[in-house]
């Protein structure tokens, strides 16, 4: 299962700033117009002037936005950025090891080649941390997709060149209980997991079934919408991972999963919270 989230949830122990990125999405959102959110991790968000955010992140945001935009919405590089954010975080926390220790070459990270090539170049150009940049790129990618929510971002993670243990990412053939327990052990609720897996709304698979390479998990892979939930349950999606079917039927997850069908506001809210 290539759940493509955990953007901001692991490895954020030494955070310096928190921000959302107004104006990174070409689709207007009133929440993006109110300004930059900056705060210490331990206190509530506060609206603060853009000047309080290091300019480098605004520069990177502009550059990434342009590279993530495609015809009709977000493109394949954006999809890779969303997935990479999850893959870097899940095993040992968000520490940049995905791109600092050769993990991109593992079979479990097939399909991330383009983002694994791009982000180290951006890091070298601007002198930011790899762990921070991977999560920032994932957040920008979500916002660039039409209907994507504004994503808070926390800077200050510690980079690591120590590879994570291979084979620890959720499996595309995992049972519902197995997958739920993996996430529960990391502090996620059933609603969190149901929301996070919805990132498959922008997913296209190339390696699970090579005969159907490029098949999406719903009919609108360029849009951050809830079509994934309804189409997966109805069996009308172009392609569905076995793990997704299993999670949608899992006793704890199936309720919130069904609750996101046709409910964009509820899903966006749950995804950001998760």
Where would I find each of the regions flagged by the language model?
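Catalytic cores of secreted/periplasmic or lumenal enzymes
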Residues: 17-274
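Cleavable N-terminal signal peptides of Sec/SRP-targeted secreted and luminal proteins
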Residues: 1-18
């Amino acid at each position: 299962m290539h759940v493509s989230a955990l953007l901001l949830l692991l490895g954020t122990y030494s955070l310096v700033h928190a921000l959302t990125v107004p104006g990174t999405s070409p689709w207007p959102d009133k929440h993006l117009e109110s300004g930059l959110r900056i705060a210490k991790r331990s206190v509530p968000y506060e609206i603060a002037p853009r000047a309080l955010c290091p300019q480098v992140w605004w520069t990177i945001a502009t550059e990434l936005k342009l590279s993530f935009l495609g015809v009709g919405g977000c493109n394949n590089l954006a999809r890779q950025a969303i997935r990479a954010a999850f893959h870097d975080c899940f095993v040992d926390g968000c520490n940049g090891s995905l791109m600092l220790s050769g993990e991109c070459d593992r079979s479990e990270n097939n399909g991330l080649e383009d983002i694994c090539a791009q982000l180290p170049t951006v890091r070298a150009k601007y002198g930011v941390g790899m762990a921070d940049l991977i999560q920032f790129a994932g957040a920008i990618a979500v916002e660039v997709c039409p209907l994507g929510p504004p994503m808070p971002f926390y800077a200050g993670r510690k980079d690591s060149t120590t590879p994570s243990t291979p084979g620890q990412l959720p499996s595309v053939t995992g049972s519902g209980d197995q997958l739920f327990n993996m996430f529960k052990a990391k502090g996620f609720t059933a609603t969190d997991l149901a929301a996070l897996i919805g990132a498959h709304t922008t997913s296209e698979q190339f390696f699970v079934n090579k005969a159907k390479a490029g098949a999406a998990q719903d009919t609108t892979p360029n849009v951050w919408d809830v079509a994934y939930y309804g189409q997966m349950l109805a069996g009308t999606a172009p392609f569905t991972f076995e793990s997704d079917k299993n999670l949608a039927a899992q006793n704890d997850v199936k309720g919130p999963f069904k609750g996101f069908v046709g409910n964009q506001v509820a899903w966006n809210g749950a995804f950001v919270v998760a």
